[in-house]
């Protein structure tokens, strides 16, 4: 290990233990590399899960036994929506509208406006795939317990389609001991910026306040 400490802690990193298509290396490899280059702590934030937690925890115990002063930060990069109830409601409305249009077209009902089937499929797919990224970090034991509960709930049928999701209500329920950060370009702040940038800086600021 280098004797020079680096005044930087990475709070957003993926491992092949939980983000196989978006990572290089297992948690222990990340931790060793960080320590050997002067790092004193590192967060692991895999996509939608904490599958790397046991790797991270056990390797930390090994490092500790070897006299290496290093702090693992447990976390996740969650898939976030403001309201899962509204998301589900929008999906159900689009799905029912598409079914109704198809039924009216088949029955030859006069005056029926038939939507393009491909456009309907795109609309449904767009809603179903909707999510933002949000980095959540464990602050203490209470936070770790709450993080496990939050992630477990995100995989419930009503919250899951291709991706496990959390919303404001769930975050409020399990907020104690958890720190939230804005993640990446897929995060809510960056998303609001790109969606409103052509409207000017005030529109961007207002969207971010919301």
What are these model-predicted stretches?
Residues 1-210:
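Phosphodiester-processing cores and adjacent nucleic acid-binding clamps
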């Amino acid at each position: 290990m280098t004797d020079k400490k680096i005044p930087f802690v990475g709070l957003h990193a993926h491992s092949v233990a939980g983000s196989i298509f978006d990572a290089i290396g297992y948690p222990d490899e990340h931790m060793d590399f960080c320590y050997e280059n002067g790092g004193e702590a590192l967060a692991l934030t895999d996509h939608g899960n904490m599958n790397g937690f046991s790797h991270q925890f056990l390797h930390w115990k090994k490092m500790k036994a070897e006299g290496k002063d290093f702090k693992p930060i447990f976390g996740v990069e969650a898939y976030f929506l403001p309201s899962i109830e509204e998301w589900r409601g929008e999906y159900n409305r689009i799905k029912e509208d598409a079914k109704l249009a198809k039924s009216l077209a088949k029955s030859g009902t006069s005056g029926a406006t038939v939507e393009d089937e491909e456009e309907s499929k795109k609309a449904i797919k767009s809603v179903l795939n909707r999510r933002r990224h949000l980095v959540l970090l464990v602050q203490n034991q209470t936070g770790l317990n709450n993080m496990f509960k939050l992630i477990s709930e995100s995989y419930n049928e009503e919250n899951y389609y291709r991706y496990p999701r959390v919303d404001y209500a769930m975050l409020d329920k399990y907020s104690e001991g958890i720190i939230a950060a804005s993640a990446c370009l897929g995060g809510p702040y960056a998303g609001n910026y790109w969606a409103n940038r052509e409207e000017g800086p005030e529109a961007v600021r207002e969207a971010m306040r919301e």
